[in-house]
Regions:
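Accessory, usually C-terminal, subdomains that scaffold auxiliary metal cofactors
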Residues: 225-303, 310
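Phosphate/adenylate-binding glycine loop and adjacent helical scaffold
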Residues: 2-233, 304-312
Length: 312
């Protein structure tokens, strides 16, 4: 197995890289604020599956050939045996040839149902390694209950990845029920983020370029999303021509404003489940999630660049 591919996704919502902290919104929705505050500690629990050996081994065990296939197939499997064009569209920032290298071939090696099951087995093993005794704690059970409440009656029109994952059965154990709810919530946020990128007129490459301009990891994003240096440079040129980047490919004031608007719209579009949970529930879930995410970070299961402390 090629372990160098194990850093392929690094997919934290937004999918184009770490989200920059935007300037304060002049009239913030409090639940948009909760969406932002809850995102990072919950994301630390979700993304364990993208980096843990346990999930990779689970995919290899059902016949998938490598880490990259496991990533694209496992995140797509909730939608069924979709064509690569569907995954490319819903994941947004990965090049079409990169996705087409593993889909639909993966569906001939394992069914989407078997891939979903393998993902859960790998996730459970990884979370148990990362959390230790906390995996079976009352805090995990309470967090699962709260995160699940945020999903009750959730409208997913226009949110294909969130809808697909919401349609999966809720696992019976609190640990996996928590991961399932977090996954629906992060895909819900991600679907809204992609809409914000489209509304801002940022195509997949331009989305990545602006993520780098906002402080995202340039080497990592350039090497894992499947775009050529020429395609990347062309994206930079388009953004300079729009006045969003300067000659050093850093943000102009206009570029910073556009990216800040994307982040504000992402938070606003992610607010609905947290509004359902209510402020006391949001505050309690944040109180529960932060120690769990710090335990995961301290376990060494995540790459160092993703294991920093979550913001207050």
């Amino acid at each position: 197995m090629d372990h160098s591919r194990r850093t392929l996704p690094g997919v934290s919502a937004p999918a184009d890289g770490p989200d920059p902290d935007p300037a304060p919104d002049p009239d913030p929705d409090p639940f948009a604020g909760w969406a932002r505050r809850l995102y990072r500690p919950l994301e630390a629990l979700h993304i364990v599956g993208y980096f843990a050996e346990e999930t990779t081994q689970a995919y290899l065990g059902i016949g998938l050939t490598d880490y990259g296939m496991g990533y694209f197939a496992s995140r797509s499997a909730a939608m069924g045996p979709v064509r690569p064009e569907v995954t490319t569209a819903t994941f947004y920032v990965f090049s079409a040839p990169l996705v087409a290298a593993v889909l639909p071939r993966a569906w001939g090696l394992a069914s989407p149902e078997d891939i979903v099951d393998a993902r859960l087995r790998g996730i459970e093993a990884a979370l148990r390694r990362g959390l230790g005794d906390a995996a079976d704690s009352a805090e995990v059970a309470e967090a699962a209950e709260l995160a699940g409440q945020a999903l009750v009656g959730l409208e997913t029109a226009g949110r294909p990845l969130a809808a697909a994952h919401l349609g999966l059965p809720v696992p019976s154990t609190p640990l996996l029920a928590l991961w399932h709810a977090i996954t629906v919530l992060r895909e819900y946020r991600g679907d809204g983020h992609l809409a914000a990128l489209v509304l801002a007129g940022l195509d997949p490459v331009e989305s990545l370029v602006t993520a780098v301009a906002g402080g995202g990891p340039a080497k990592f994003l350039k090497s894992t999303r499947g775009w050529s240096p020429e395609q990347w440079a062309a994206g930079q040129t388009r953004l300079r021509n729009r006045g969003l980047l300067d000659d050093d490919n850093s943000f102009t004031d206009a570029g910073q404003a556009v990216r800040g608007t994307v982040e504000h719209r992402t938070d606003a579009a992610a607010a609905a489940p947290w509004r359902r949970l209510g402020e006391p529930g949001c505050a309690r879930l944040l109180e529960l999630a932060r120690p769990l995410s710090r335990t995961i970070a301290a376990s060494g299961i995540l790459p160092a660049r993703l294991a920093g402390p979550d913001p207050s």
